[in-house]
Amino acid sequence: MGFSYAPTVQVRSGEERAALVRRTYGLVFLSVIVTVLGSAFALSQEAVLGASAQHPFIMLLCLLAPLWMAQRAAREFPKNLILTFIFTFIEGIFIAPFLYVANRTAPGVVGQAAVLTLAAFGVLSLYAVVSRRDFSAWGSFFMVGLVVLFIAMIINAFVGSAAGGLWIAAVGVMVFAGLLVFDTWRLLRSGMYGQDDYVLAAVAIYLDLLNMFLFILSLLTGGRNRR
């Protein structure tokens, strides 16, 4: 997943690209840590956990606002980092009820999903690095898949089919795996990012990683608990 933008200062050398990659993955790592802290906070506060579970649409609005602002201020340091961390902390609160239900359904499954996600992240990132393929067409293809996935999730929310939820989880893993390869290729190989675009790149990869984790977790719990 990614945002529309025009690079400000194009990366011109291998050293500049290496710096961009370090800053991007550093921010991805910190964003994951902040998300874990957000979930830990919600899980330790019954009132916060209950509010997140009972008012998902309000939480979604609270989530999208800093994401939108982070996109708008993507090149304005330190505002870009502050907004990104606000977004990822709220994201942790937002997914906390799902983590709670998943762990109650199958104790230890959250850790298993995290390990599988990290393994998949490593393999897919390596594939994007070593492959000589041009992945530019993957973005539009998997974005269409994302729209279809979203529609299927809405339909299944009313139908309540466990089998449907399982299929949605499996497709969700594949869609975000494809988007992760695309966004990694875009960072490492495409030359689409400028020197100051590390926040845009990091948020795109973070969202791919997080959603892949959530769909893997849903798959491990039988597709019943995807929020």
Where are the model-predicted features located?
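A hydrophobic alpha-helical transmembrane-helix feature that marks the membrane cores
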Residues: 1-227
